[in-house]
Each structure stands twice: as structure tokens, then as C-alpha cells.
Regions:
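N-terminal Rossmann-fold cofactor-binding loop
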Residues: 169-173, 208, 231
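Glycine-rich phosphate-binding loop and adjacent beta-alpha segment
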Residues: 212-274
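Short amphipathic alpha-helix with an adjacent loop that forms part of the alpha/beta core around
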Residues: 191-200
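Glycine-rich beta-strand-centered segment in the early N-terminal region that forms part
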Residues: 24-42, 51-92
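NAD(P)H dinucleotide-binding glycine-rich loop of Rossmann-like/cofactor-binding domains
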Residues: 84-146
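C-terminal hydrophobic helical "lid"/dimerization subdomain
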Residues: 259-311
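Mid-domain Rossmann-like dinucleotide-binding core that forms the NAD(H)/NADP(H) cofactor-binding site
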Residues: 120-189
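Short acidic-hydrophobic, aromatic-tinged amphipathic segments that line or gate anion-handling sites
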Residues: 185-192, 285-290
Length: 311
């Protein structure tokens, strides 16, 4: 039996260095689950490591992709066979077959459709944990990269948690109608004056951009406010020390590394229920061989759909 996978064997732009390769399927390893993948989304966290941005811990040759959903096809225990799971910490999810340690397999309830389950890990869990660590009930909140999946979840769930006002910094004007419909106060990324003004009013900032935008906000936040940095979509670092406060960083992998398996598995019980009540972009499904088209959609400014690879 053969496996098909998207590999990168050197750093570079994903469109240039990813290759779809067919290789013989390795022998099954006892103690793991062999998962036949159904869908995997295209996220910034899938593509950024390919460029070499995290070369201190992620390096080629490697299969791309960090999340997705599939069905268990082989296991030591027959009770696993046929169950849908998220195979976390496997060897890359942009492939037809993933071998996953049993403790890192998250069962998916029957009520959750594949296209939602496939994107049920990185962005939802990060947003949920940040709001758990930095609760926002009764507070004013600002999110950057407001059109991104994680920021969209943060904004929705902040309002659900009882945030007073939620501001969203956007880049593409195509995002404006959706932000207004969601009750988010929109701030154009080009309007530094309004961003600075809003920063002076808010209690918590969830920032995925970094660079000059993070620096601008840090310079205008009051001494009781908090800025949580969870990404660098700008590709530019910034000094975490502002005039009044020091930025705090959130990394999902760091949280999982110090959390007992039983505890974080339990988080998903709450997360699945919440996701079923949450607005998400429609999926645009591409066959694995159409991965270039999936990346092209991902790059479109103001896109309204989430690209998924059908594996």
C-alpha cells in the first residue's frame, strides 16, 4: 500500500518547495493508531514553518500540516477501529495516512461533521485557552488580524463571555460586512490614529500580527491593560516592553507540554459543544493533488471560505 504526502525537503515559499510524493506505507507500529485522513485545513501555522521561520525546532525533510480528521484503520485494540479522531502530534497531517500515539488521538463526537472537526484543534483550542487564562467578562477587547480564524473565534467567544466592546483590526475591506454583522467595532489596519485611540480604551489585546502594529498598541495601552501575543503574521518581531506594560506570550504547544493528557483531552468535551454553536467560514474542499489551488485561495485577501484538503 502507498501513501501520498506533501513534503518539504528544504525551506522556502510553500508553493515552491512543497512536493506531492508517493511512497510505500511504513509498517504499523504497535502502540499507535493508523488513521486514514479525511480532511486537513490550511492554516498559517501549517505554512509558516515551511519558510524556515521556526528552523530552531522545525526542519526538513518533513511532511506539512498540523491538524485534520480521519478514521482509525489499524490499532492494537479493536475498539479504536472505525472511530473518527484528530491525530495530534503525528508526523504531518497533509498525507493520506497518519500514525499517531494513542494518547494524542482526540475522539470526535458523531454530532460534529468532518469539515468542522478537521479545524477543531489549533485555532479553537488556542482561542478557548486564551480566554480561559485572560477572561474578558465586563472588559473591552481588541483583536488583530480580525479576519483570521483564531481572531474570529476570539471575538465571538469574547462577546459570549460577556465582553463589553470588541474591536477588530482588519486588513481587507472585504472583511468589513462580516465584522459589522458580528457586532465587532472595525478598525482599518491603515488607520493608526483610531487603533491608538482604541488601544487606550481596551483592557485586553489579543495580537496575532506583531511588528509595528504591536508596538503601536503597546505604546498606547494603559497600565492596567494586557497585550497577549500569540502570533507574528507580519513576520516582524517587536519589543515586548511598552510604555506602561510588558506583552505576554501565548504558545499552544507550551500549554499542552505541561498539561496532563487527561486534562487537555477533557477540554475538547467543552470545545466540541462550543464549536457547534459558533459561526465559521464555509469550507472550500480541494483534492490533495489540487493543493496549489488550496494555497491560492488561502492567499486571497478577504477570502470568505476556509480551504480544506480532501486526503
Amino acid at each position: 500500500m502507498e501513501n501520498a504526502a506533501l513534503w518539504f525537503r528544504q525551506f522556502g515559499e510553500p508553493e515552491q518547495v512543497l512536493t506531492l510524493e508517493q511512497t510505500p506505507l511504513a509498517p504499523f507500529i504497535s502502540g499507535t493508531l493508523r488513521v486514514r485522513m479525511h480532511y486537513a485545513p490550511v492554516n498559517p501555522s501549517d505554512l509558516i514553518p515551511v519558510t524556515g521561520a521556526y528552523r530552531h525546532r522545525v526542519f526538513p525533510p518533513r511532511i506539512a500540516g498540523y491538524e485534520g480528521v480521519g478514521i482509525v484503520a489499524q490499532a492494537d485494540s479493536p475498539e479504536w477501529i472505525g472511530r473518527r479522531v484528530l491525530p495530534l502530534r503525528g508526523e504531518g497531517t497533509w498525507q493520506r495516512w497518519v500514525d499517531c500515539p494513542i494518547q494524542w488521538a482526540v475522539p470526535v463526537p458523531d454530532s460534529v461533521p468532518d469539515e468542522l472537526a478537521a479545524r477543531g484543534y489549533i485555532n479553537p483550542l488556542a482561542a478557548w485557552l486564551m480566554l480561559k487564562k485572560w477572561p474578558v467578562a465586563g472588559k473591552n477587547v481588541l483583536v488583530t488580524a480580525a479576519g483570521s480564524t483564531c481572531a474570529g473565534l476570539l471575538a465571538q467567544w469574547a462577546k459570549r463571555q460577556g465582553a463589553t466592546e470588541v474591536y477588530g483590526v482588519y486588513r481587507s475591506a472585504q472583511r468589513l460586512p462580516a465584522l459589522l454583522e458580528s457586532g465587532i467595532i472595525p478598525l482599518s489596519g491603515d488607520d493608526e490614529h483610531r487603533i491608538a485611540e482604541a488601544a487606550g480604551k481596551v483592557d485586553v489585546v489579543f495580537d496575532a500580527v506583531g511588528g509595528e502594529l504591536a508596538t503601536l498598541m503597546l505604546d498606547h495601552l494603559n497600565q492596567n491593560a494586557e497585550l497577549v501575543s500569540y502570533g507574528l503574521l507580519s513576520g516582524k518581531a517587536f519589543s515586548p516592553r511598552g510604555k506602561n506594560i510588558t506583552a505576554q506570550r501565548f504558545h499552544l504547544r507550551d500549554t499542552l507540554a505541561v498539561t496532563p493528557v487527561a486534562e487537555w483531552q477533557g477540554w475538547f468535551i467543552s470545545l466540541w459543544e462550543l464549536l457547534l454553536q459558533t459561526q465559521q467560514p464555509d469550507a472550500a474542499v480541494y483534492a490533495l493533488k489540487e493543493w496549489r489551488q488550496a494555497l491560492a485561495l488561502f492567499r486571497e485577501p478577504g477570502r470568505q471560505r476556509k480551504p480544506l484538503l480532501k486526503l
